[in-house]
């Protein structure tokens, strides 16, 4: 015990995903493709929105920031995870662990409130169409983007500071593939109940607050859509929200499973599997959800490809 108290942890080791070499190959190739698709999809969405003037409206302003957050959150985790797959000692420094958690937490919380901002935007567009340009001014849109980043920063600073000022003087093997809060706290040489309660309370408050904004917005949207007489009008109105609802359901369901349910319900190993979904898969899915189910994005893609094709054809002729 004396040796445990005198040892200060300067680095952590990850257990990783699997020790089977054949599975490692499969996982590496799978998540390399997922990561490349994430970067291609999200950066492509940002470039498309920037280049196509018809997409210079609030809805796509928020979507470009969502794509930026997805690309960043995936880049915080995936490169390190991929480089560790074939390595026996999956090591990260104490400071590196704190930075990884800090950045990832920032982007996850920001994404939750960006989705809330997008829900409010859809509410105004469908329920108050005549006042849309007045309400969703450039100033309001900027505020609805700065707000999520600010809330994410505050939440992250609280959790990172409270977790990494604890003494770590014993085991330094994290049962995970990245520095998530609960696996790190399990290694602390102090009582972590306060930290776990803080995580549960803040995750609950932030989740409920952003969730209420989304829920109330969609209740009003649903009421308005049901008042539309034509079936075609109802279908068009709902189609503008379906992509957003899909993204919200996937993200909130996964985060609730990890952070809000009682910690004793499932093991850290199950958390690890679920974490793969929201660290790697969700950032990849969002741009495809919004592009495949959105006519304006598909039309913008077609216009971009046609423009590029025409330019290349002109160059060949000239």
UniProtKB/Swiss-Prot annotation:
GO terms for molecular function: G protein-coupled receptor activity; olfactory receptor activity. Residues 1-25, 76-99, 155-196, 259-271 are extracellular. The chain crosses the membrane at residues 26-46, 55-75, 100-120, 134-154, 197-217, 238-258, 272-292. Its main location: membrane. Glycans are attached at residue 5. Keywords: Cell membrane, Disulfide bond, G-protein coupled receptor, Glycoprotein, Membrane, Olfaction, Receptor, Sensory transduction, Transducer, Transmembrane, Transmembrane helix. PANTHER family: OLFACTORY RECEPTOR. This is Olfactory receptor 5G25. It comes from Mus musculus (Mouse).
